[in-house]
Amino acid sequence: MAHKKAGGSTNNGRDSVSKRLGVKRFGGQVVLSGNILVRQRGTKFHPGTNVRKGKDDTLFATMDGKVIFAKKGKFMHQYVSIETA
């Protein structure tokens, strides 16, 4: 009788879908109110003037204007602001 042993199992073979995080509008770009500026987990970038933070830490513009990135404070946190025209 011909026999073939059972193939072994594996714990690999899975991968999660990418979340498309990161900066969506860069410094100097003109944006409209409501535009998403940064998608992030945690506060790598903090909201500055005319920018608010959503419940998933997404930063979005509250006014039309130009995007500005700056490092401020004792710990040099990165802030995203909107400069209105």
From Swiss-Prot:
InterPro entries: Ribosomal_bL27, Ribosomal_bL27_CS. GO terms for biological process: translation. GO terms for molecular function: structural constituent of ribosome. One of its GO terms (cellular component) is cytosolic large ribosomal subunit. Keywords: Ribonucleoprotein, Ribosomal protein. PANTHER family: LARGE RIBOSOMAL SUBUNIT PROTEIN BL27M (PTHR15893:SF0), RIBOSOMAL PROTEIN L27 (PTHR15893). Belongs to the bacterial ribosomal protein bL27 family. NCBIfam families: L27. This is Large ribosomal subunit protein bL27. The gene is rpmA.
